[in-house]
């Protein structure tokens, strides 16, 4: 079950050329994205040139699995010669002089970059309402949010603008939008993909991820972008087929841990979807075992102390001097810094910078930042202890279906959207979200989390689940291939 393999067959048979396929997707984006606002920069000329190159490779019989396959990139991955904005006024005119490792790996395998995707500014947000380029709409219901921060990545794939897209996940930013848009998306183990050329939010949490309809496509793409990178000291080498090595194996020996206390207070329709999903895993031979997950509210508090601190440090570089927005009315250097940052950053980014600077202040450091780091270590140890008993932990990907735009503009209520996804980021563990049912006629997702670098177990489990139970009901008509 793979859109990538379907497109590969069409390209190899000559049914369609890479240029024709690219033109189809570009036409659909031009016609339909006005309603969704998922694209910041459309790379039409570049895409057609890459498609021509792909056709030449195919004609020579030297193609790989991904040659000529279209892709869209979240607009925080640097792309040489194409602007990279991070959805911020601060970087509105920034054109990167180099490619991120993620985008370079895609180019090296002959993929066609269609464009750069909308997102919450600097990846800070859970709704994609915090973008300098406007909010993104959910293709399932245009009045609702697609989730965030990778909302454009999710909305574009759900709308059929590309078969696959990249995203980033700092606290759930690929998994929560996947849940809201009926997609499969994965945050791999911290260090399995390079962060070089990815605009930084919180460096010890950030990780590149992939969106697709099918888990097999997500696994194929993660194999494509993963691996060692000399420019990222936190990136470790994983073997070439790390994510796809076990996709054909059954899951009859797997043990899934479930904390019932995390499910009992969910809306009834989501509880029903969770129950049905666990029953389906049992039918595939997996064992369901009761476990106790660390307090999620403590995880949320820990996350919203450490990540703003890291963000404050990472965003200190944007001062209007070397690159980025520069206020034209500043009369001296101090005023240039102050006015450029005041005008260049949006409200949510400024909020998190202020929180970060507060918790890092010498008078508050021990009370907040130091304690949060200690708690992070304790929670990571507690979660890893659970994996001595189980292969994976199942949780919802979000406490609700997609909500209406403007419903959660209060920061605290918006932050609670990440409550189920944050534990994987705190502990650096892999986690995959996949569609499991509907609530109020909108898709909802489940989530599996595994031990560090056991990513292959997650892709195996979800591929087998989708092979037996299908996901056609979660694919909108306009996105079908």
UniProtKB/Swiss-Prot annotation:
Keyword ATP-binding set for record: yes
One of its GO biological process terms is: translation
Q: Which keywords annotate this record?
A: ATP-binding, Ligase, Nucleotide-binding, Protein biosynthesis
In terms of InterPro entries, this protein maps to: Amidase, Amidase_CS, Amidase_dom, AS_sf, GatA
Active site per the UniProt annotation: 74 (charge relay system), 149 (charge relay system), 173 (acyl-ester intermediate)
Report the PROSITE patterns cross-referenced here: AMIDASES
Q: What Pfam family is a match for this entry?
A: Amidase
According to the UniProt entry, what is the EC number of this protein? 6.3.5.7
Q: Which reaction does it catalyse?
A: L-glutamyl-tRNA(Gln) + L-glutamine + ATP + H2O = L-glutaminyl-tRNA(Gln) + L-glutamate + ADP + phosphate + H(+)
HAMAP family in the cross-refs = GatA
User: Which protein family is it in?
Assistant: Belongs to the amidase family. GatA subfamily.
What this protein is reported to do is described as: Allows the formation of correctly charged Gln-tRNA(Gln) through the transamidation of misacylated Glu-tRNA(Gln) in organisms which lack glutaminyl-tRNA synthetase. The reaction takes place in the presence of glutamine and ATP through an activated gamma-phospho-Glu-tRNA(Gln).
**What quaternary structure, including any partners, is listed in this protein's UniProt entry?**
Heterotrimer of A, B and C subunits.
In Swiss-Prot or TrEMBL terms, this protein is called Glutamyl-tRNA(Gln) amidotransferase subunit A
State the organism named in the record: Francisella tularensis subsp. holarctica (strain LVS)
Q: What is the lineage of its organism?
A: Bacteria, Pseudomonadati, Pseudomonadota, Gammaproteobacteria, Thiotrichales
């Amino acid at each position: 079950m793979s859109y990538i393999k379907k497109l590969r067959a069409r390209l190899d048979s000559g049914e369609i050329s890479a240029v024709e396929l690219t033109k189809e997707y570009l036409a659909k984006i031009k016609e339909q994205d006005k309603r969704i606002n998922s694209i910041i920069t459309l790379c039409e000329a570049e895409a057609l040139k890459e498609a021509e190159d792909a056709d030449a490779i195919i004609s020579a019989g030297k193609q790989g699995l991904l040659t000529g396959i279209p892709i869209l990139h979240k607009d925080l991955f640097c792309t040489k010669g194409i602007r990279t904005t991070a959805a911020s006024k601060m970087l509105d005119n920034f054109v990167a002089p180099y490619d991120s490792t993620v985008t370079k790996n895609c180019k090296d395998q002959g993929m066609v970059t269609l464009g750069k995707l909308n997102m919450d500014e600097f990846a800070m947000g859970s709704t994609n309402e915090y973008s300098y380029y406007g909010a993104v709409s959910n293709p399932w219901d245009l009045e609702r949010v697609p989730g965030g921060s990778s909302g454009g990545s999710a909305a574009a794939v759900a709308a059929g603008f590309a078969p696959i897209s990249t995203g980033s996940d700092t606290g759930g930013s690929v998994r929560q939008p996947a849940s809201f848009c009926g997609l499969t998306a994965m945050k791999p183990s911290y260090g399995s993909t390079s962060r070089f050329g990815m605009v930084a939010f919180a460096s010890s949490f950030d990780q590149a991820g992939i969106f697709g309809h099918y888990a097999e496509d997500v696994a194929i793409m993660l194999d494509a972008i993963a691996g060692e990178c000399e420019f990222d000291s936190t990136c470790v080498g994983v073997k070439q087929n790390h994510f796809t090595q076990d996709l054909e194996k059954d899951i009859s020996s797997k043990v899934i841990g479930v904390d019932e206390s995390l499910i009992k207070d969910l809306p009834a329709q989501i509880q029903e979807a969770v129950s049905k999903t666990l029953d389906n895993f049992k039918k595939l031979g997996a064992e369901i075992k009761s476990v106790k997950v660390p307090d999620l509210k403590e995880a949320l508090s820990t996350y919203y102390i450490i990540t703003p601190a890291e963000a404050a440090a990472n965003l200190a570089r944007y001062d209007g001097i070397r690159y980025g927005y520069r206020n034209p009315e500043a009369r001296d250097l101090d005023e240039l810094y102050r006015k450029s940052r005041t005008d260049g950053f949006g409200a949510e980014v400024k909020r998190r910078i202020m929180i970060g600077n507060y918790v890092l202040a010498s008078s508050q450091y021990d009370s907040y930042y130091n304690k949060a780091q200690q708690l992070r270590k304790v929670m990571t140890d507690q979660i890893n202890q659970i994996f001595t008993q189980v292969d994976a932990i199942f949780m919802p990907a979000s406490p609700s279906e997609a909500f209406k735009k403007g419903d959660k503009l209060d920061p605290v209520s918006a932050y609670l959207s990440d409550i189920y996804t944050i534990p994987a980021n705190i502990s650096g563990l892999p986690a995959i979200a996949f569609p499991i049912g509907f609530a109020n006629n909108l898709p909802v997702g489940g989530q599996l989390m595994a031990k560090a670098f056991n990513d292959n177990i997650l892709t195996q489990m979800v591929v087998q689940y989708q092979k037996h139970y299908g996901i056609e009901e979660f694919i909108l008509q306009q996105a079908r291939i």
